[in-house]
Amino acid sequence: MKGQETRGFQSEVKQLLHLMIHSLYSNKEIFLRELISNASDAADKLRFRALSQPDLYEGDGELRVRVSFDKDNRTLTIADNGIGMNREEVIDHLGTIAKSGTKAFLESMGSDQAKDSQLIGQFGVGFYSAFIVADKVTVRTRAAGDKPENGVFWESAGEGEYTVADITKADRGTEITLHLREGEDDFLNDWRVRSIISKYSDHIALPVEIEKREEKDGETVISWEKINKAQALWTRSKSEVNDDEYKEFYKHIAHDYSDPLTWSHNRVEGKQEYTSLLYIPSQAPWDMWNRDHKHGLKLYVQRVFIMDDAEQFMPNYLRFVRGLIDSNDLPLNVSREILQDSSVTRNLRTALTKRALQMLDKLAKDDAEKYQTFWKQFGLVLKEGPAEDPSNQEAIAKLLRFATTHTDSSAQTVSLEEYVSRMKEGQEKIYYITADSYAAAKSSPHLELLRKKGIEVLLLSDRIDEWMMSYLTEFDGKAFQSVAKADESLDKLADEVDESTKEAEKALEPFVERVKNLLGDRVKEVRLTHRLTDTPAIVTTDADEMSTQMAKLFAAAGQAAPEVKYIFELNPAHQLVKRAADTQDDAQFGEWVELLLDQALLAERGTLEDPNQFIRRMNQLLAS
């Protein structure tokens, strides 16, 4: 062999191999699915390239995968006649992992997590899965269109290094030979290999053939037997495809080891002709929040594979949806640029978005437990929807789930439809509060009057919630109202004030003026309130004023936010307010008012500009 060299694996590959061999061993047969899946992708790529360069077929357009074994040498070989690889591609694909964020992902995995095959599985280990059952892997490959002498040899024991060299290979494509570990002779059994291929690869459009050896006239005759249906699953009628086939096809296109939660398979004819097969995963990919995370659907045109990750067919808030679209209306030479400006794409995006939302709505109605799994994994992504897609806002709002004062649990399980069904007679608005945590929202003094009246409040504590609510203005004709903002509907909820209370409050007017004079422009307004039962004071904002949580979002993003001007509301029935009102000494009065304001700000913001001053003041007043 010419040009032979030994190279070290990228460190991430070594880590991944170690984790994978130990964590996926219990489900080791998946290596065959992964290698056949890769062969199918190689055939798809060749078909696509050959649209503009038919010579790449080299006179052999019958694409297939062939599986054979050699019992004497204990090897299993998977060979395809797809696109193949040149030397540079071999080093890129088999010596490194190109995914960004890989290192951080692997470092975050502790020894316990290493046992989690789902976590490793969703990484999409592909080729490296061969080392689960093999102690040495040999690859012989040649890129379509290259000369026979430009073949490439690659070999590794899956430890620290691999060997690469130049060889002569007459036919294009890739041949992977697994030298099986001791105890893995199961994979040299014809029936066993057939059953694995049938289980995992029936849906692949590429014929998968297994070697047959027969003795005739003292000679061994080799033939090849096709053992899968070799028809693209999405082109078959729904009634012909069973659940297991749909699940296996999902694992093939999504490179995920978990079953999907649900799917929707549809063929549309008429003005537009297309087939779609959409899936909702059961687990978020580990790099979903990585800016480089690829998402989108597989695109086929007239059953010819065009591209992976075509994100033009789904809005960003549905980026977790996996699957494919096969269109009859797009040109075969379509590019990402053409897709961007195509009216066909826009129409497909509208239709597929509606289909995905309907699929989620059906899941929510049919299986609340599965929908909760979806919500825990992807709820934060779906919450981007009301801002991003106003035309589907009502449909998205139906899918949102919240923690509320009704359930006494931090689990987000309550739909807006449920909330509306429990609204009190005369209640006009849907009440909510945003806070840094569920505990802070639940114990907020803003809820006191609503609790007393038995009115349910949505408790929002995800970082995105305040931003979402600035776009989500109503549901089922009912407006949303933050309980931290001043509003007439909240004032109406308070009990009727009797004459003696009115007189007592009139007597407090000089006190309110005194507080205003003391605080000056540090607050927007000072007033008495009937919204409180146990708390002496709160701060609220006007309807058009920026909220506390929104100001925090700006600050977290490093942006300057206008200073929030609060309304300082005092509970005239509370003993501390009465005590402050009765204090004649100006210095002592100032300390009481500052303490009440600090308490209200602490409850609202969770922090104070000067906590030491607050502690000093508290200690002083407790001791007096």
UniProtKB/Swiss-Prot annotation:
Write down the Gene3D superfamilies for this protein, in alphabetical order.
3.30.230.80, 3.40.50.11260, Heat shock protein 90, C-terminal domain, Histidine kinase-like ATPase, C-terminal domain
Example GO molecular function: ATP-dependent protein folding chaperone
Concerning InterPro entries, the annotation shows: HATPase_C_sf, Heat_shock_protein_90_CS, HSP90_C, Hsp90_fam, Hsp90_N, Ribosomal_Su5_D2-typ_SF
Where is this gene product found?
Cytoplasm
Key words of the record? ATP-binding, Chaperone, Cytoplasm, Nucleotide-binding, Stress response
Region annotation (B) ranges: 337-552
SUPFAM superfamilies linked to this entry: ATPase domain of HSP90 chaperone/DNA topoisomerase II/histidine kinase, HSP90 C-terminal domain, Ribosomal protein S5 domain 2-like
Per the record, GO CC terms? cytoplasm
According to the UniProt entry, the coiled-coil residues are none
Report residue spans for region: C.
Answer: 553-624
Instruction: Name the Pfam families on file.
Output: HATPase_c_3, HSP90
Entry annotated with the keyword Cytoplasm: yes
Q: Which domain of life is it from?
A: Bacteria
Q: Where is this region: A?
A: 1-336
Subunit structure comment from the entry: Homodimer.
Task: State what this protein does.
Answer: Molecular chaperone. Has ATPase activity.
Identification of the protein by name: Chaperone protein HtpG
Organism of this sequence: Klebsiella pneumoniae subsp. pneumoniae (strain ATCC 700721 / MGH 78578)
Gene that encodes it: htpG
